[in-house]
Structures are given as C-alpha cells and as structure tokens.
C-alpha cells in the first residue's frame, strides 16, 4: 500500500519472536518484500529488553534495497544496521517496470520538514550499474541486447512487409549500433545485409 502510494523507503517495526531458523526466514522475507515493492525496506525487530517468559526477541535489524540485503546486525548483539538507500534508483526501477503502477488514491499523507544532515557515505554506488564489470558477463549482456534489438527489428520488418531498412548515419555510436542491429536482423530473416 505504501509503495503504491509512492514510498521509496518502508520501515517495518516488528515484534518477531526468535526461534531456530527465524533469522534466515527473516532475511528472505525482507529481501523479497524490497524486491516485490521496488523499495528500500527497513526491518527492526523488538530487542532483548522486550523479551518475556513466553517470547524471546533478538533485536535483529535488516536493511534491503530492491531484493539485496545491504546491512544487518547479528541477532542478540544489541547493535544497529545502517547504510544508504538509493531512492533515485528505486524511482527509476519503478518507471521501467511496466507492472508497477503508482496509485495514491485513499492514501493519507502526513507532511513534515526535515533538515538534511551532513553525512559521509558508507556504501559504494556503481556509476554504471547496468554494465557488468566482469568482461565475460559484459560480453554476454551486450550479445543479449543485440539479439533482443535484432529480433524486435526483424519482427517489425516482417510485419510491415518492408523490403529494405533505411538508417540515417551520423557517425555517432547510436547510428553505429542501429547499423549492427539492422545487419543482424537481415541475417536473421535470411536476407542480404544490403537490404
């Protein structure tokens, strides 16, 4: 509900009792929620001081972003989890995801002012998150992109009964990519590249 109203960070203050295996379950739950809602997800469980004769609380804290656990404290250690969440990334992911549609209808928003605090970032943010650092994975990713584009163009050329593909060449990288895709599409259709 909060994510559909536009929240990019959701805090879950929980009183989840501790049992054997519960920490692993909690990690999976928090990771899945953050992925499903395309958000930063803060999970803070009741701590040791809340334990009773019937229930034991471990104070397990977790922070996840879009399916990845970024930070957590160990259950029973009394510490805190802290990190940064890339809210702009979450907004971009939502804009790209066609099955995620914002709807704030019936949602009550409480306005407040908050002065930004001076802080030092502790998390490395990849400046090129969609370009794998590993050369083999990068080559595989590029090949997949070319295949996807060529397949889409081939389908369009077939559907339009086009005899040729016309490309405006400026000498830039975009027109170079367009030419590579067009050649692959023609090859896929069993037609000469000159078409």
What are these regions (language model features)?
Residues 34-38, 66-69, 87-89, 95-97, ...:
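Glycine-rich loops and low-complexity Gly/Arg-rich segments
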Residues 1-81:
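CN hydrolase (nitrilase-like) catalytic-core segments centered on the catalytic cysteine
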Residues 80-157:
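Flexible inter-domain linker/hinge segments
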Residues 114, 137-195:
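ATP-dependent adenylation/nucleotidyltransferase module used to activate substrates
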Residues 2-4, 121-126, 187:
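Short hydrophobic/aromatic-rich motifs at helix boundaries and adjacent loops
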Residues 10-13, 126-131, 161-162, 195:
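Short acidic (Asp/Glu) and glycine-rich catalytic loops that position anionic groups and cofactors
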Residues 21, 93, 177:
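Short acidic, gly/pro-rich beta-turn/loop elements at beta-sheet edges
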């Amino acid at each position: 509900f909060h994510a559909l109203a536009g929240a990019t960070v959701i805090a879950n203050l929980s009183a989840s009792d501790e049992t054997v295996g519960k920490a692993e379950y909690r990690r999976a739950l928090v990771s899945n929620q953050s992925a499903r809602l395309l958000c930063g997800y803060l999970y803070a469980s009741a701590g040791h001081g809340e334990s009773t004769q019937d229930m034991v609380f471990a104070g397990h804290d977790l922070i996840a972003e879009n399916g990845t656990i970024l930070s957590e404290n160990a259950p029973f250690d009394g510490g805190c989890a802290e990190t940064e969440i890339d809210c702009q990334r979450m907004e971009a992911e939502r804009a790209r995801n066609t099955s995620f549609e914002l709807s704030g209808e019936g949602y009550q928003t409480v306005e407040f002012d908050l002065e930004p605090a001076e802080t030092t970032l502790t998390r490395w943010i990849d400046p090129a998150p969609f370009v794998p650092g590993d050369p083999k994975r990068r080559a595989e990713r590029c090949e997949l992109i070319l295949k996807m584009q060529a397949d889409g163009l081939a389908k369009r050329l077939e559907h339009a009964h086009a005899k040729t593909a016309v490309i405006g060449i400026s000498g830039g990288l975009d027109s170079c990519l367009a030419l590579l895709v067009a050649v692959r599409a023609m090859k896929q259709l069993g037609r000469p590249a000159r078409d």
